[in-house]
């Protein structure tokens, strides 16, 4: 049966290929290969390195496609027919296919070609993104277009014909067509009235284009005009004369303060910018005005006259440190909701006090005030007194001000405040209230260095599964990244309504004993991560009766102190605690033997050393057993190598989510999941599992989500997942699977909602079963067309599993064997008759001539052959020369030339002992075809070298054979007259050792030729013909 089976295998493969082809015709394969169909009619072709727009088959539901994204491919040419097949296409994204040279990662120039009817063939198109492409003109566009993005292109001119016919256009973005990353050496030219025909245009953005004036005759329908980061340093009423519908105007960054710039900056000219008093007075509908980074020192109240609807004002990154203490510009802005004054600092100066101007009290609708980066060191009631009368104020940003004294009790006068950010300051503790007078320029000035202006590290966000956010709480105070060493109750006096307090990234090293937070009777969330807390007292945090979330992560220093005990019994005395994080503390010994709580829902214990704790016999075996209501438990990064059933059995039975990511688990007892009857999510990603073979998921388990990604799984036993009937999400990505078998799942396969098998080295052999299976469950496989790729064979490695051509899907080894055999038969069948007909007698004659010649030639060679190809002569007293001869010359000529190896005669190796020196020398000279002289210098030659040279000259006179070859190792030997004469007569017999390693290969080739050919072939015929043999 074996031979028959082998003969029928190609036929079966052809049948399978035909079946797959039929499946393709019936639409079983993903319809938009190589792209992916996503919800709401979006076809995602991003990051596929496509060089042309894919043409989808007629069987695909092309009429359902409303959005096509071709982001970050390599499409340089768009044809008229590329999108014509998509009759209902509304959104098209072609961003970053052919970026200009300045924006390309390798700075390669690129020009995109767009044929005239490419977009006109799509009359339903409404949104088009051509940004980050090397186009120089606006292509022909359909009249249906509503949104057009031409940012970061090479378009440098707009005239009335550029956008003609686009009467429906509402959004036009042309940012960054001429700036430091996309240089052009000029400015974007917008001809007067070029956009006037766009009667419905509401949004226009021309940022980063080197503009020096506001384009003239803009459409009066504009509501959003963004002109930031150009070079417009003068604004007059006529610049915005007809734009009475404007709601948002951004003219920031046109006259920059370069001491705070994060990119190339041009200093603002002296006495600029020049803003006319009535520049904005006619913009009665204006709601947002951006004047950031404009080198403003004063605020003219007339600028804001008539702006009764202004709700957002951005004045950040200016020089308003004096102005904000006495300005009256805010008196008429009763509707203002957001005001940004950040980084209005004096260069290299930190002031002692700051007192806001009384006009701030007129901002009755203000909800958010950003004052970070103004640099004042004291925060008192006087500082924010005008804000106390603002009933709507909710968010106040005061971070990065180098505040070292802060009276936190002043915030009791702000009943509407929901969020106060005092992070990244230098607050070290409570201060007594003091009366402070004087303006911002009063008091002592402290000069700052560049190091002081460096921002601190960002906080590490916590997963909301284990630590809730404060965004929904009514009052939050952020004191993270300050200089707190201890926490005193006086700091929070009169802040009883505080619900969230962040104290992370300080240096708090005290032993909390239940008295530090007494005034905070309403506190629900407390963040003390990244500190040095000493958890010794059993009543820690018990003064917080409403505490629900406590973050004690990254407090590892006390736990690393040998011999010091730690008390976690306070957890049992927090009756409302729901979330607790003890992550990344390195907890390994001398802690409470058990955590107890009836209220705790989520515990993050990642980044500790449970492996060491559970290795201490039964001491910590029941460490988590007392958490009766625990639902979520994170045990990631605990250096666990095994997880015994007794360990799982002592976890809380109420657990629904268990994370064991990034441990060292090479084995997991799946049957022990019955010990956790309520477990719904198990995360084993990033471990060292090699196979899912020891048993299977138990029957009756409640498991719904299983993550075993980033392991090394190469095998899954049949039926492993079949009994877990409630399993809906399975992540098998980033393993070593070569196939995905339907037998793993049984009847469960149809119930899966997510099956991730990406980043596995799947073996894409002909008739691979996993292809049919993945097609059956393709709705559950994320990124099936693009992210599920082949790992073998080599020609398909890294390509989609659908990349192979079904017509070529044959047995590869059999194909090669048949091809080789047929080629050999054809070649022999053609060659033999042809050779016999054309040159049969010649071949017969050459064959017999060769038989007669070979023995005679061998006898003649034996009679005339010499013992050595070359006799090597050198000065043994020079160790460097001797080392070069033995370790370089000998190895190269005798060992590395293979069949062309030369036979060298060396004095110390080949001279016969017992003979005189002259006898050995005579025999060596006359038994060698050539004499190779290796010289370091040619000015002093004596001893054996001189005698050998004289014998070579004698041989020249007697036998008329020039056998001398010179190898000169030192460059100063070129001064020798003999060397220069011999170079002139017989250049190939004088070789110089090259200084550069790149020339050594040529040197050895020249030396081999010099030793194997007669010197008479090397003589310069212009001077002589060389020695000739006597007749």
UniProtKB/Swiss-Prot annotation:
- Kindly list the places in or outside the cell where this protein is found, as annotated in its UniProt entry: Endoplasmic reticulum membrane; Endosome; Lysosome; Cytoplasmic vesicle
The record's section on InterPro entries has: Leu-rich_rpt, Leu-rich_rpt_typical-subtyp, LRR_12, LRR_dom_sf, TIR_dom, Toll_tir_struct_dom_sf
Record membrane topology: Single-pass type I membrane protein
Say what the protein does: Key component of innate and adaptive immunity. TLRs (Toll-like receptors) control host immune response against pathogens through recognition of molecular patterns specific to microorganisms. TLR9 is a nucleotide-sensing TLR which is activated by unmethylated cytidine-phosphate-guanosine (CpG) dinucleotides. Acts via MYD88 and TRAF6, leading to NF-kappa-B activation, cytokine secretion and the inflammatory response. Upon CpG stimulation, induces B-cell proliferation, activation, survival and antibody production.
Keyword line: Cell membrane, Cytoplasm, Cytoplasmic vesicle, Disulfide bond, Endoplasmic reticulum, Endosome, Glycoprotein, Immunity, Inflammatory response, Innate immunity, Leucine-rich repeat, Lipoprotein, Lysosome, Membrane, Nucleus, Palmitate, Receptor, Repeat, Signal, Transmembrane, Transmembrane helix
- Family that this chain belongs to: Belongs to the Toll-like receptor family.
* Leader peptide range in chain numbering: 1-25
Instruction: Name the residues that span the membrane.
Output: 818-838
List the ranges whose topology is Cytoplasmic. Answer: 839-1031
Give the record's subunit note: Monomer and homodimer. Exists as a monomer in the absence of unmethylated cytidine-phosphate-guanosine (CpG) ligand. Proteolytic processing of an insertion loop (Z-loop) is required for homodimerization upon binding to the unmethylated CpG ligand leading to its activation. Interacts with MYD88 via their respective TIR domains. Interacts with BTK. Interacts (via transmembrane domain) with UNC93B1. Interacts with CD300LH; the interaction may promote full activation of TLR9-triggered innate responses.
User: What is the protein's major site of localization?
Assistant: endoplasmic reticulum
Give start and end of each TIR domain: 866-1011
Please give an example of a GO cellular component term from this record.
nucleus
Q: What is this protein called?
A: Toll-like receptor 9
**What organism does the record attribute this protein to?**
Equus caballus (Horse)
Care to name a GO molecular-function term for this sequence? siRNA binding
- Which gene is transcribed and translated to give this protein? TLR9
Impact reported for residue 47 to A: Significantly decreased binding to agonist CpG-DNA
Any keyword Secreted?
no
Q: Which residues are glycosylated?
A: 64, 129, 200, 210, 242, 309, 340, 472, 513, 567, 669, 694, 731
| Pfam hit, one | LRR_12
Q: Which residues lie on this side of the membrane: Extracellular?
A: 26-817
